[in-house]
Amino acid sequence: MAHSMDISYRQGIRSKGFAITCPTGTTQQTLSLSGLAKSFEGLIISSAFTATPQTLINPKQLRVTLTINNDVSIDDDSAMSYAIPAVGGFAGGFPFFIPIPRRLTGQDTISIRFVNAAASQNVDVTVWYRNEL
């Protein structure tokens, strides 16, 4: 029984969060996952406030590009397409993410770039991945 629980644990989905400050202009961030990561499952972007506390942001003003091992997976798209709304929560199940499945090797280069057309914003990016396929 312990062996089957070990396999189930290793195959389970995991998440890692990144807090990114996006001043006006372009911000690039490396998303470093565990060296055991074998499958990128997807991501979700969330942000409720600008760098000025209690000020709601408009995610439409953010553009996002996601690159996984030189493969541009999201190319200059509205961050709103990958975001949880600032109010009202979400109706999805758990885990809730935008699927962007990609194989990983454990020595991957994953980067996300935001282009911000307005005031500085704090953005949370949650990446979902698996250690085994």
Model-assigned labels for residue ranges:
Residues 1-133:
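Beta-strand-centric surfaces of beta-sandwich/beta-rich domains
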